[in-house]
Structure formats: structure tokens, C-alpha cells
Design a protein with these regions (language model features):
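Short coil-to-beta strand junction motifs in C2/discoidin
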Residues: 69-75, 147-149
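Edge beta-strands of jelly-roll/beta-sandwich modules across compartments, strongly enriched
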Residues: 141-153
Length: 161
């Protein structure tokens, strides 16, 4: 229920021939508090790559409440290949969710909820066919991060074919 607008956007993209994978997960603290991203919670997303000649754009989806206490979100991703080994270095990403000067929310909003899609890995080449796992980790300076409602991953073939 918490992912209705983001899920709706995902449903609309079902006709998108470039989309290889998209999934989003709701976040909650270990004690069950909704919309809290705990530093120990590392959502993983598993997707299959068949065409190793193609390039792929990898996006990170973020849903936040307007009460989120920062203008940005740092997260680190780890990509694991079909052989279970790292498929490149773990990278740190900064996503700007609100204007740093005005505090005005960015992204698509409905009420006090805002959805963002950030191009994190443009033109990614996957060297081996098979199943990949992408793990996200919040990299802010507090263990409990209230106001981040959901995160997700989208993988799309560059050129839409």
C-alpha cells in the first residue's frame, strides 16, 4: 500500500521494451517502525542479464517523505556477478532529494511523498550472462534514517531494444 504511486509508475512502464528489471522495497526499522532505513538493512535486487553485447542504464529509485531531515541521501552499491564475485568496485552515490538552498522537494510528488529515479550506472556493461545481485546500503551518518520510505532498482537496455 505504501508503494502505490511508485508501483503505479512501475506498472505503467510494463510496456517499456527497454526495461529488463524493476523492483522497489518498503523500508522499516528492526523494531518495526515504518519508513526508517536502518544502517543494517541492505536491500538486494536480483536480475538476469542475457545480452552481454548490450549496454544498460541502472537507476536507483528512492521514495521519501517531506519530513526527511536531509536534502540528500548517500548510498553505496555493491554489484555481484553470476559467479558470486564483485562485478566492479562498490561505489558511493549522492542523491539530491531537495533543493539544498530552499528545501523545496524534488522528484514527483503527491502530498508529502516524493519519488525519485536517479541514473546511477549509465551505459553499464555486464561481461557475463546470468544473474546479478545489486545491494544498496544507506551511507548517512546516523544508524536510523527516518523518512526514507522505499528504495529500488531499475535496469534498462540502452537504446530501448
Amino acid at each position: 500500500m505504501a508503494l502505490l504511486p511508485l508501483a503505479g509508475a512501475t506498472g505503467l512502464s510494463a510496456c517499456d521494451p527497454s526495461r529488463v528489471y524493476e523492483n522497489n522495497v518498503d523500508l522499516k526499522s528492526p523494531s518495526g517502525d515504518a519508513y526508517v532505513w536502518d544502517v543494517q538493512q541492505r536491500p538486494s535486487f536480483t536480475f538476469a542479464i542475457a545480452d552481454t553485447a548490450a549496454r544498460y542504464d541502472v537507476y536507483f529509485n528512492v521514495r521519501n517523505a517531506s519530513g526527511y531531515g536531509f536534502y540528500n541521501l548517500f548510498l553505496k552499491h555493491t554489484l555481484t556477478g553470476p559467479d558470486g564475485r564483485p562485478a566492479g568496485p562498490a561505489l558511493l552515490h549522492q542523491m539530491v532529494l531537495m533543493d539544498p538552498k530552499t528545501g523545496e522537494p524534488r522528484g514527483a510528488g503527491a502530498g508529502d511523498i516524493f519519488d525519485h529515479q536517479f541514473l546511477a550506472l549509465p551505459g553499464q556493461h555486464f561481461a557475463k550472462a546470468g544473474t546479478y545481485k545489486l545491494t544498496l546500503e544507506q551511507y548517512m551518518r546516523q544508524n536510523q534514517l527516518p523518512g526514507i520510505m522505499a528504495v529500488g532498482v531499475r535496469v534498462a537496455k540502452v537504446g530501448g531494444k
